[in-house]
C-alpha cells in the first residue's frame, strides 16, 4: 500500500473522517449543519479545492467534501475509473451518510460525475451547480475542432505510462494550473499542495485511468449528442469563467435535450479554477441558486 500522501491541511470548523465505501476508503471533509451540500472536486485537486467556499457555505448547509477515488487522502486502487463506478461511489457515500437527497456543487470531472448522477438518479439531486466543465447536453458543431488544441493534455494524460509521467511532472502541472487562469488564479501554496498529492505513483496512475475511463469517453458522448437524447430535469447552473475552454464550448454550441432547467453564466475574466480564485463569488451564487424557490 502507498504511504501517506502528505500532512492534512487544516481549516477551521472542518472535521475529517474516512469511510469504507464499496470496498475502498474515502476521505470526507465536513463542516456546518443543515441540509446536505456535496462538493465534488476536479483534476488534479482534492477536497482542498473548496477551502475558500466551505466556511461560507457551512453557515447555511451541512457541507460534505469527499476526496474522490484516486485523489487526495482517499484510496487510489488500480483498475478502471469508469463514470459508472464514480457515480456509484457518490451514491454509496450518500447512503453511508444517511442522505436521501442533496444539493451539489461540482467542478471539472466532478461536474461530469454530478451531471451523470443527476441524469441517472434525479431523486438524489435537489439542484446542481457545474463549474469548470460544459453542460453535457450541448449540441456541438463543426467548429468544435478549434477547441481541440486547448485540450491536448486530456489526450496525453489518457495514454498509459505517458499519462502518469505527465501528472508527476511539476512543470506540466504548473502549466495546467495557469494556462486558462487570470494572474494569481491558484496560489503557489495551493498548487504545491495539489501537486504533492497528485504526483504520488498510485494517484498518477489513477489520474491517467480517469481520463481513459471517464473524461475522454464523456467528451466523445458530448460530441455525438448521446447525453442530449436523455431526459434531464434537475435544476442546474453552469457557472464558468470566460478564459477556459468550457466557455468556448458553451458559446459555440446550442443546448439540446428533453426537459431540464439549465442556466449558463459565463464570468468575465475568470478561468478554470474559479472556486480557488473567487470563492466568495462561487459561494454567493451557490447560495442564491440553491435558495431559489422551485415548483414541486
Spans of model-derived segments:
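A short, glycine- and basic residue-enriched loop/turn
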Residues: 46-47, 112, 271
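Alpha-helical elements of the RecA-like P-loop NTPase motor core of helicases
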Residues: 48-51, 205, 284
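Flexible "cap/lid" subdomain of the alpha/beta-hydrolase fold that forms the substrate-access gate
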Residues: 2-17, 24-26, 36, 64, ...
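Catalytic histidine-centered segment of alpha/beta-hydrolase-like enzymes
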Residues: 270-279, 283
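Conserved beta-strand termini and adjacent loop/short-helix elements that scaffold enzyme active sites
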Residues: 31, 267-269
